[in-house]
Amino acid sequence: MGRDRLLITLLVGVFLAAASGASAQQASGIAGVVRDESGGVLPGVTVEAASPALIEKVRSAVSDGDGRYNIVDLRPGTYVVTFSLAGFSTVKREGIVLTAGFTAAVNGDMKVGALEETITVTGATPLVDTANVRQQKVVSAELLQTLPSGSQALQNLVTLTPGMTGTPDVGGSSGLYRTNGPRASTYHGKAGVKVMYDGLNILAAGGTGASNGYLPNQAFAEETTLETGGISAESAASGISMNVIPKTGGNTFTFGANTLLTTERLHANNLTDELRNRGVAFTSKVLHLYDLNLIAGGPIKKDRIWFFAANRYAGNKNTVGGQYFNATQGTPFFTPDLSRQQYRQEWVKSLGTRVTWQLSEKNKLSVFADTQGFYNRGRGEFVAPESSGLAFNLAPQGLYQASLNSVRSNKLLLEAGMSYAMNRWPFPSPGADFMRVSPDDISILEQSTGFRYNAKQTYNDVVDQFRIAERFSVSYVTGSHAIKFGGQFEQGINNQDQQVHGDVNYIFLRGVPNTVTQWTTPYLVKNRMRDAGFFAQDQWAIQRLTLNYGLRLDHFLAFVPAQDLPATRFAEARSFDAVDNIPSWRDINPRFGASYDVFGNGRTALKFSAGRYLEQLGAGIANDNNPIVRSVLSANRIWNDSNGNYAPDCDLTNLSGNGECGPINNLNFGRSNPNANQYDPAILTGFGQRTFAWDIATEVQHQLRPGISTTMGYYRNWSSKFRTTDNTRVTPADYTPFCVTAPLDPRLPGGGGYEVCGMADVAPAKFGQVANVVTRADPFFADGSDVTCDSTAGVAGRNGAACGRSDFFNVSVNSRFASGIQLGGGVDTGRTVTDRCFVVDSPQELLNCRIITPYKAQTQVKAFWSFPLPLEFSFSGTVQNLPGASFVADYPATNVEIARSLGRDLAACGTRTGAACTATATVPLIKPMTNFLSRRTQVDLRLTKGIKLTSRVRLQAILDLYNVMNASTVLAVNSTYGSAWQRPVSDNAIGGVDPILPGRLIQFGAQLKF
């Protein structure tokens, strides 16, 4: 009830404060110059933009002293622009198609004559935006319905955008969550995708704020935009932003149903001899996939109240290639049950409605609610099914929004809006009745392969990741200026518990126990965040030049409430006071861009943009500083199972070596010591402490002929202000270097047998002594260093997944002809350098510290087409040629192998020596970004047939064919050097992606409209 009251209070506050636009950061517009027959500018001309997409029917402006006009905040749609002035004939421009975020240059040439005389001009829609500098891809609902898009999702933007990476998918077979999740997406080396609905952030509040729980229903999408650069000061995005522009209904009732279906019999087997040689017994198989949307829209009251509603039922079930259930579950052994293949199953139920109400001539209210339940059984990761994220029940969850738009005059516009994204992500221990897992089953990791079985590493009964967002803005528009200022505010709630079966995990090496991990579970952490941003910007047209400039002031604040924990097996009862300002960061972020209409005809534009963007953050930064987490929640100790009973025969509460167990590797474990891990107070507050990136772009856009345009560009980004972790109890002098000889293997460089040096082990006297401080990285930089990244931070967030320096080039073409033919695509390539060559604690940090991702690893070719055929047939398709993933060889070297070079046993051994010590160290046998899998080529096709059932009822029959060539490209392999090295496995780092491209898939679909 407390959250409900808060939600209602915030909604009321927003409505009383001001008003909000549906277009937000992707506002469209029409602008231009009005002239007379002699070429002189005409002030005082009334310019009206009319469209069925506007519930108010028409928006207007008046040209200024330079003859310029500017109509902003228009919805996507088809417009008629009318120019009228006493003493001149009225001029109409018809068929102006606006996409989201596009400003169409529509100039008016007026002749002397009677006002009643109307001259109608029908011409091609402008394709070059000479006003804006943002780099964006706009995908309309019409285009998605035309192309082979499977279960329509955010992944479709990745398929159509050269340079964008994401989850490989064949007709929706990768699942509902992964095709809608932004976590795996990057663009030109940048990660941290912000997903917005109607201009408001809807991602979960936990972690770095880059994951989703709520799944947008694409039936509501009029258009979806992807901004990849040149983003204005209005946006708090970290460099990449997706925004769904929702449908509103209209003055005509429309009803319909969209559906698709496929089954196991329609999915081809693509198992090849090459895959069998890699140890693959079977590839992934779609058992069923369905998606049904029932939609309705129209007027509740014509010209006043519109509605649009959609009810979605969708689901999928797939086998996971090469993986089986455990026939000996509940024992220390994994025995593949060849009669039970691992599977992944998901289903979603969603019911949503949007209402748009023209309150008065100047005020418009929009309300949206979508309540859904999303369910998951199995993840498809490289783990035994019993140890995967087994039973996600994301219910109830949903998205609830309200916005108000107030056009005070043809120059003044007020906007405001509010959103409540309810994201839940619990994955509880499933119990003995589900997938045969008992709470007594201990999670086991086989170190030689990286394979986990018997139980999940950790479980969560509570994962609340709620996000509340608000925004407001004021726009003042003249013919030459579009001034806008306002703010966005977000509040995040993240409650998450942690449970571990038996409060321990086991690690085996080739079936022999060698490590036990202890946890202070169960516990519940509470984290909170607030993100506020204020901006001011202007778009200034000076003859052919348009300047876009603005400034943002961002303030990110995280805190945790008071928390109490009961005593657990390995920890005493603890109480912690509330902690504020962890961190409290302020930043000033300039944005600048310029667009020059080279010939003054709106057909060629030269563009430049530069901006400072902040790392994406969520409540995870509060979690880092939460005193519960800072007290050390888990620690490792070696384990020599001398009696072979697969149970650690030692006193685990004794942190010193005893029985079969060595000493704990962190002496803070189990103690009430919130200072064991902490942030340097100097970087927790103030200006400019947050990691940021600069992003610049130069582009040339040219309309080759009516209906065809091309873009060529150069793009560069780099990040700065890194954080790093310093264990203040040790120095580089406390480490001893060693080398390891690589195994002899023809698959290794030179056949193996070479030495890998640069490894280091801490002195035994310092083992377990930890006092970690997260601090600025730059004091550790050597003179003349070229550091572009560190191990803990990057513009994508706290994990440094996308930091460094990137240079990219892009050439793309887009066309749409009056005949209905559409063609598009492009080539994108680039190079990324990540340099982390500095030492904080261990000299080993210099090993492979400079990584270059070459052009060949980032060159993409993408294209799409759509051709109307006779008899209401249509043929369309997409093609992608993408680079293969990189892979490495991480070798778990034993103490015996290491001691030869180290001159002693590893520090983790304690009093054990030689083979009696089961400690290991991971040795990288291959330098990152030097070995790659084969490139992937994927062709998807669609054939449609329009059928007129009655005068009002139409059916479109759809036949889709995905992965036409039945390619079996390997997408990810095991990078742990051992018996399973280079075997195709799911990429667990991004939630498990199919290791092999699924085979040819046939889908049947239909769209019914009346």
Where are these regions (language model features)?
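Periplasm-facing N-terminal accessory domains of Gram-negative outer-membrane beta-barrel systems
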Residues: 2-140, 201
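Periplasmic N-terminal accessory/gating domains of Gram-negative outer-membrane beta-barrel systems
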Residues: 64, 88-248, 267, 274-285, ...
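Solvent-exposed loop/turn elements at secondary-structure boundaries
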Residues: 154, 167, 179, 562-589, ...
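Transmembrane beta-barrel wall of Gram-negative outer-membrane proteins
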Residues: 254, 284-375, 393-420, 590
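Gram-negative outer-membrane beta-barrel transporters
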Residues: 556, 711-888
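Extracytoplasmic gating/loop element in the C-terminal half of outer-membrane beta-barrel translocons
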Residues: 662-669, 673, 677, 779, ...
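C-terminal beta-signal and terminal closure region of outer-membrane beta-barrel proteins
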Residues: 969-1010
